[in-house]
């Protein structure tokens, strides 16, 4: 597990130490789980509440609700790896979002899939949009796109009673 932190540069470690110290209000060498979200956001990350809970349970070995600096470093090393993946997803989203309005319409999805050699029927494209479109606005925003790409939402057709 510690091998993750070996890929961090001294500069990154110093930056994380600074951020950590900023939120270690009482200077006892630990930050509370509530403060973790604030620390992550200050470093350009944008974790959801669920992601924060997952991260905390991954590194809070003794379950005391606080994270010490070595645990924090491991966490940040892990998040840096995920950020690379996130950059790739953002680039992919831009490919689909032809007009750059922050949403993927059925027409945009159909256009890109066709160019990729995927000949999809109207129904298949509409189905992909429906499954990814969590807020029901008929388009796919970035969060929905990420969820679709990381959870394989389009593979769940059979589970939703589609026969």
Curated annotation (Swiss-Prot):
PANTHER family: CALMODULIN LIKE 3 (PTHR23048:SF0), MYOSIN LIGHT CHAIN 1, 3 (PTHR23048). It comes from Chlamydomonas reinhardtii. This protein has four functional calcium-binding sites. This protein is unusual among eukaryotic calmodulins in having an 11-residue extension of its carboxyl end. This is Calmodulin. It comes from the Eukaryota. The keyword Ubl conjugation does not apply. The modification N-acetylalanine is found at residue 2. The keyword Calcium applies. Keywords: Acetylation, Calcium, Cell projection, Cilium, Cytoplasm, Cytoskeleton, Flagellum, Metal-binding, Repeat. Belongs to the calmodulin family. InterPro entries: CALM/Myosin/TropC-like, EF-hand-dom_pair, EF_Hand_1_Ca_BS, EF_hand_dom. Ca(2+) 3 binds at residues 97, 99, 101, 108. Calmodulin mediates the control of a large number of enzymes, ion channels and other proteins by Ca(2+). Among the enzymes to be stimulated by the calmodulin-Ca(2+) complex are a number of protein kinases and phosphatases. Ca(2+) 2 binds at residues 60, 62, 64, 66, 71. It is found in: Cytoplasm, Cytoskeleton, Flagellum axoneme. Residues 11-46, 47-82, 84-119, 120-155 form the EF-hand domain. Ca(2+) 1 binds at residues 24, 26, 28, 30, 35.
């Amino acid at each position: 597990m510690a091998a993750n932190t070996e890929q961090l540069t001294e500069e990154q470690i110093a930056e994380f130490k600074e951020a950590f110290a900023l939120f270690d209000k009482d200077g006892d060498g630990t930050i509370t789980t509530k403060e973790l979200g604030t620390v992550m956001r200050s470093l350009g990350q944008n974790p959801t509440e669920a992601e924060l809970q997952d991260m905390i349970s991954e590194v809070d070995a003794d379950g005391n609700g606080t994270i010490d600096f070595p645990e924090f470093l491991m966490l940040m090393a892990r998040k840096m790896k995920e950020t690379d993946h996130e950059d790739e997803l953002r680039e992919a989203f831009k490919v689909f979002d032809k007009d750059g309005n922050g949403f993927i319409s059925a027409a945009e999805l159909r256009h890109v899939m066709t160019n990729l050699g995927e000949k999809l029927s109207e129904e298949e494209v509409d189905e992909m949009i429906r499954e990814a479109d969590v807020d029901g606005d008929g388009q796919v925003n970035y969060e929905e796109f990420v969820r679709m790409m990381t959870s394989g939402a389009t593979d769940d057709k059979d589970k939703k009673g589609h026969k």
